[in-house]
Design a protein with these regions (language model features):
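Metal-dependent amide/peptide-bond hydrolase catalytic core
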Residues: 1-161
């Protein structure tokens, strides 16, 4: 039996994370005691990123701006994901609302082939993957437009905060 067992825990809320970590500690400790280990197990928690939970009002405002600029045929809600993202650390620390969005950047043919074969999760590399390689254009232009449109949703004179 190995002397360590690294786990990667991803949850959708801090409350669920606490419940899961407490359960792991309880189960591992009980198993070690039942097996007669000479000492209690050690637990080391590192690289914790909190769940990213968009503020509804902020998201609605930015989404409306995206819909108006890009068209509703080019905007959609991202499905719930268990990605590790440190984006929310700063706004959570400052106590300010935020919204996190994504833009497409995968080669359309690569995406289509993966979707047709039912292999999106394995054939389309996500952010932070060593194989992640978005197409340069129109990804850069779309990302720049998205940032400007989101900023103008708050800063333009016709959109008072």
């Amino acid at each position: 039996m190995p002397d360590r067992s690294p786990l990667n825990i991803r949850t959708y809320s801090d409350q669920t994370r606490t419940i899961v970590l407490d359960a792991i500690r309880r189960i591992v400790t009980a198993e070690c005691q039942a097996s007669g280990t000479p000492r209690d197990p050690d637990f080391e928690i590192f690289d914790h990123s909190p769940a990213t939970t968009n503020d509804s009002a902020t998201t609605d405002r930015v989404r409306a701006a995206f819909d108006a600029h890009f068209g509703t045929d080019r905007t959609f809600d991202l499905p719930l994901q268990t990605a590790s993202e440190d984006f929310s650390d700063i706004p959570r620390t400052l106590g300010i609302p935020y919204t996190y969005w994504g833009i497409g950047g995968i080669d359309p043919d690569t995406y289509r082939r993966a979707e047709e074969s039912g292999r999106l999760g394995s054939d389309v590399p996500a952010n932070h993957s060593p194989r992640f390689a978005p197409v340069v254009q129109p990804t850069i232009d779309t990302g720049t437009e998205a940032l400007v449109v989101a900023a103008l949703a708050w800063l333009a004179p016709s959109n008072p905060v």
